[in-house]
Amino acid sequence: MLAKRIIPCLDVRDGQVVKGIQFRHHEIIGDIVPLAQRYATEGADELVFYDITASSDGRVVDKSWITKVAEVIDIPFCVAGGIKTVEDAGQILSFGADKISINSPALTDPTLITRLADRYGVQCIVVGIDTWFDESTGRYQVYQFTGDEKRTKATQWQTLNWVKEAQHRGAGEIVLNMMNQDGVRNGYDLTQLKQVRDVCHVPLIASGGAGAPEHFLDAFKQANVDGALAASVFHKHIINICELKQYLSQQGVEIRTC
């Protein structure tokens, strides 16, 4: 059995790490490189960096900090933000990133997933999915351009259908960003995770809602996700990564200890 992964998420805007609630009202957390170093030292298995306004601004992720991060950490990291071409992805990988993640550009042009997978291999192609539960319809809907409040919009895709489509086109991993839960720390949406797990045959990463060690345990035990991504609980020192891993190990979760 592969070890489960604990993945701090660093949302990047204007060269700094920020954090919002339900993808809104972002506050500045700190500088990118020191935070990356901190999490690598504290026992993170992997890091994810999202340039949250790149797609809505019509630009690719700011590459200036990627090389610096690669120089100071020795764990894998993934970079996302406005990657629209095979060349964009190649540059980011050449600067030291281990994976690239695409979200809004894949919704605009789903063939991008296949072209990236064909060029670089499915193992380094992640598809991020921003999903919102609409109480009025009882459906999970995929949203696009979520880094910009003015441009955020619902797409034609229901979440389960897009998960299937992304895999069919070559996604090697799915990160499910559950927007309703983002930053509120009341737990991952286990109902949604279980539904997605049933149709997701590549590694699945839960994102949005972690507030306590038990929330990570629930995601691993009840929804059988491969990794759990979180931000505010790590940024604000609410949860210590090593202590979290010790707790999960004691509860029978296969995980790399610090």
Swiss-Prot record:
The record's listing under InterPro entries reads: Aldolase_TIM, His_biosynth, HisF, IGPS_HisA/HisF, RibuloseP-bd_barrel
Any GO BP: L-histidine biosynthetic process
Gene Ontology MF terms: imidazoleglycerol-phosphate synthase activity; lyase activity
Q: Where in the cell is it found?
A: Cytoplasm
Keyword Thylakoid on this protein?
no
Q: Does the keyword NAD apply?
A: no
Q: In which pathway does it act?
A: Amino-acid biosynthesis; L-histidine biosynthesis; L-histidine from 5-phospho-alpha-D-ribose 1-diphosphate: step 5/9
Give the enzyme's EC designation. Answer: 4.3.2.10
Ordered alphabetically, the record's keywords are: Amino-acid biosynthesis, Cytoplasm, Histidine biosynthesis, Lyase
Location of the active site: 11, 130
GO-annotated cellular components: cytoplasm
Record's family?
Belongs to the HisA/HisF family.
Function summary: IGPS catalyzes the conversion of PRFAR and glutamine to IGP, AICAR and glutamate. The HisF subunit catalyzes the cyclization activity that produces IGP and AICAR from PRFAR using the ammonia provided by the HisH subunit.
> NCBIfam families per the record?
hisF (TIGR00735)
Q: How does it assemble?
A: Heterodimer of HisH and HisF.
State the name under which the record lists this protein: Imidazole glycerol phosphate synthase subunit HisF
Q: Give the gene symbol.
A: hisF
